[in-house]
UniProtKB/Swiss-Prot annotation:
EC number: 1.4.3.22
Record flagged with keyword Transcription: no
Cofactor note as given: Binds 1 copper ion per subunit.
Top-level class of the enzyme under EC nomenclature: oxidoreductase
Provenance organism: Homo sapiens
Top-level taxonomy: Eukaryota, Metazoa, Chordata, Craniata, Vertebrata
Topology within the bilayer: Peripheral membrane protein
SS bonds (residue pairs): C177-C181, C391-C417
Tissues of expression: Widely expressed with higher expression in placenta and kidney.
Keywords: Calcium, Cell membrane, Copper, Disulfide bond, Glycoprotein, Heparin-binding, Membrane, Metal-binding, Oxidoreductase, Secreted, Signal, TPQ
Name under which the protein is recorded: Diamine oxidase [copper-containing]
Amino acid sequence: MPALGWAVAAILMLQTAMAEPSPGTLPRKAGVFSDLSNQELKAVHSFLWSKKELRLQPSSTTTMAKNTVFLIEMLLPKKYHVLRFLDKGERHPVREARAVIFFGDQEHPNVTEFAVGPLPGPCYMRALSPRPGYQSSWASRPISTAEYALLYHTLQEATKPLHQFFLNTTGFSFQDCHDRCLAFTDVAPRGVASGQRRSWLIIQRYVEGYFLHPTGLELLVDHGSTDAGHWAVEQVWYNGKFYGSPEELARKYADGEVDVVVLEDPLPGGKGHDSTEEPPLFSSHKPRGDFPSPIHVSGPRLVQPHGPRFRLEGNAVLYGGWSFAFRLRSSSGLQVLNVHFGGERIAYEVSVQEAVALYGGHTPAGMQTKYLDVGWGLGSVTHELAPGIDCPETATFLDTFHYYDADDPVHYPRALCLFEMPTGVPLRRHFNSNFKGGFNFYAGLKGQVLVLRTTSTVYNYDYIWDFIFYPNGVMEAKMHATGYVHATFYTPEGLRHGTRLHTHLIGNIHTHLVHYRVDLDVAGTKNSFQTLQMKLENITNPWSPRHRVVQPTLEQTQYSWERQAAFRFKRKLPKYLLFTSPQENPWGHKRTYRLQIHSMADQVLPPGWQEEQAITWARYPLAVTKYRESELCSSSIYHQNDPWHPPVVFEQFLHNNENIENEDLVAWVTVGFLHIPHSEDIPNTATPGNSVGFLLRPFNFFPEDPSLASRDTVIVWPRDNGPNYVQRWIPEDRDCSMPPPFSYNGTYRPV
């Protein structure tokens, strides 16, 4: 790395000089968490390019032997400084960017990160390290568009001997293919040891849903050199057998020694051919078949007669009792920050850390696949949301900018949406019967929630990320999985690792795991962790001493140390996970928020097993740690391609076994599910049953249900004469788009 002569003292002086006076409005204060604007991204880009000693080249240059800026995103200031700015009115923390540079044009290629600031007019940079003494290896870098282009060229050249083989067995080719081209899916980790960059590629026919069209051929390519001329195919797998090279496969094919599978033509009418005589591809989304009760009209949709009931200013949201900021981090995804309810902070940060999918299979690519999606730009693949499908048409859509494997900021329109919606179930209700065929009163509060949503399409899979805010102080984080399954070529042996989904297709067994960081600040930063469980007691009946009573009692456990509060998957996780404040509610209970996890996850890899080092967080459905600035993330963009020597090892967060009583606490939550693909996953996995997440629920935090402040409540009182009295606090709408006027009878009588 070229020598950089910026002094630390000069940086500190600049940080102090650029600090701003305390802002007075919420939107301006929320800006401390906001993603970099298009102008800020360009300013960082220009500043880095002005440093001639970096010898930067465009990302689009088709070579690995270059220095290029791969990623620019906002670098979150230290929590201590942010809280003093938010709560004490002190100076605005200096605004900085994180820049990741691939240094391939030097004797020892590496990846180096820098903090660049102050923004909006940067004038310094300093090196960053994921942990002291760690240097990200060249092989650990995420794959780039330029590398993909070189890989495709390598495949074209290496598979020339297989041209006739491809035409005869698939009808597609890498050579002069026009609308009948072959494509590939690369899997990771890329090798079997740190420092390797050897990828198995699944060769597929490039048609709609090509993920489901493997040809039976998989290739192992070594692409570790910065000189793509040295890249080579090391092994070949075809229909259950290994070959040493494409030439060997071509030779044995010509000699009739290969067990060939000739695939049916997926495009009998040609690409794009729209014929009513030909059924659509099984991987297509085109409708086919009929319901017993056909539906030929559009369904219900939301309306907002008076516009949105939330306020959105910049990256700040206000909704009923809620206020929070948000950002869409290019590397790892959606974060909500500075979350308040009723004017009190509940959480400083709730964020997605990583999403993994760990597979099994009979083919080499199937058994090698362990996807760690932050290594594929989990937060940057946030493509446009469709109104009326991905979000209600009433949603407010938000654009974002990402600088990820590009030469300029890339504009992603409608990457996020924010909307209020009815849940379809009351938040609460009660029918108070008079047990005489009538009622004393009916009271109900309609279920309404605010949803902040984005999606990540990581190649074949689509993740839908939601943060949901309820009017009673409950916050929910949820992930829905959909998209195409990761599939390999059918062999009879493959049925041990998945399900046959089509003639030549196996849907491979896999487990989805998602890791969240939940920095709870329950009425302050001094919190403790405890659990409540139900325990049965068997006692003498006090009013009938000859009999006994079995009844539940409360069993409370206080956790003093991090190791005590790290729950392994094989250990029973208590149902009530409580983060308490020293403060008490009016009834003498600690003001508390409960973490409630909804997950079907289990441990997938044995502890200490090779690649498991990159996902040691996956040992724990819950681990509670003391806040440390050195423990802000549980994964990184480097874990995918070097899981054997990752920069962040979550297990090390627990080694110091710090005290967690009356401390600033962080909950690390793992959720997920086992997915055994089935025929109904064609063409795409559906969202019902494939969602996981957790809730943060007030537990003695308030003196009563805070949703009593909602004016959506409706109470109905019976009258002896005339219509019942309906008590409302928001006038009933008479808009043409609204449902019929509300009415309620409440009687139940014999007929």
